[in-house]
Amino acid sequence: AMPADDANIQKLYRDFDGVFQNPGSLEEFAQNIMTDDTQYAAVFIPGGHGAMLGLPDNADLGKVLLWAHKTGLHTLALCHGPAALLAAKSDAGFLYDGYKITVFPDAVDKQTPMIGYLPGPMPWWVCEKLTALGVETINKKADNSVHVDRRLVTGASPQAANDFGRLAATTLLKRTDANS
């Protein structure tokens, strides 16, 4: 939800509107921009069923996630966004093996495919795939649950968006304070 009454947010949006309208490509970022002395604070993966389409198998996203982890950046994922974490595989295994997360539960997706975002049935179940790779889902409902495990910040559903934003901001500010 865009806070239309917040002048600071509206100014920030206007300042970055050109970037929002013409974002850079993930491929270009993965090839040219990733450095150890980055000014980036985090990788953000938004939610929605779209995070299940193309991103989990995207080699460039995998490179970005592995780079972010290696350089000490946080990764933030909301709702179905953790599906994209599946791209973080390397010769050493799955990057998030052993992590605990909040994510939109398969049980809810299985009850509501007729109102989902995808045309047709779900192609696969997010929690099921992540669990098979060693990730533990700690929420059972599509609620406002949020969680931090190491440098991974997750939120369970759209209902978690406000708490997720607060937790992400607090977590990133702690990192900034520690680096000052």
State the predicted function of each range.
Residues 1-71, 75, 83-180:
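Extended, subdomain-level signal for the structured scaffold at the beginning of enzyme domains
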